[in-house]
A protein has these predicted regions:
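A residue-level signal for conserved active-site and pocket-lining positions in enzyme catalytic cores
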Residues: 15, 76, 151
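Active-site/binding-pocket entry motifs
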Residues: 17-18, 131, 154
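Aromatic- and carboxylate-lined catalytic core of secreted/periplasmic carbohydrate-active enzymes
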Residues: 41-96
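Carbohydrate-binding surface patches
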Residues: 59-60, 66, 93-127
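C-terminal beta-strand-rich structural cap/linker in extracellular carbohydrate-active enzymes
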Residues: 142-159
């Protein structure tokens, strides 16, 4: 239930989560780098605005431990800007697996967002023809099956 003309703020961490909850851990420390990246893909590619808490992109800038993710966030945000404008509606799809799926669509566009939230390679069966527009991680399309490596994601053009 969205308010017309307003965008949702999507985040894995903020000043509250690193001071009051999760034993003051950031997403990369709490979940591990690859799991956190998959969660950021999911949140970044659905409707709304992705909020990256200071230090999540480069922990060293705040004297914290963790992998520098500036290139990952650059690619994630570039994909959102190019393929998933906030003018598109969102429909969440039931997959019966560890693959998160949603359709982002408008009058002339239908895009499928897939993110593998597991540590195993996972297939997703398409219900319509599609082509991969961009992927973060190893993603292959063969016939009507998209295979996603652990914690990877893709945006597909349907039709």
């Amino acid at each position: 239930s969205s308010v017309s003309g307003k965008l949702k703020l999507r985040f894995l961490g903020n000043h509250d989560t690193v001071t009051w909850t999760f034993d003051a851990q950031r997403a990369q420390t709490l979940y591990g780098t690859e799991k956190a990246k998959a969660l950021w893909m999911m949140l970044g590619w659905i409707d709304g605005v992705l909020y990256i808490y200071q230090g999540d992109e480069d922990p060293a800038a705040y004297h914290l431990e963790g992998e520098n993710l500036e290139a990952f966030f650059t690619d994630l945000i570039a994909a959102k800007r190019e393929y998933l404008p906030n003018t598109l509606d969102t429909a969440y799809l039931q997959t019966g697996s560890a693959v998160f799926a949603c359709r982002r669509f408008g009058e002339q566009t239908s895009r499928l967002v897939l993110v593998n939230l597991s540590d195993t390679e996972t297939p997703y069966t398409l219900t319509a023809s599609a082509s991969v527009l961009t992927a973060l991680g190893n993603v292959t399309l063969a016939g009507n099956t998209v295979t996603l490596s652990p914690y990877s994601g893709a945006i597909l053009q349907e039709g």
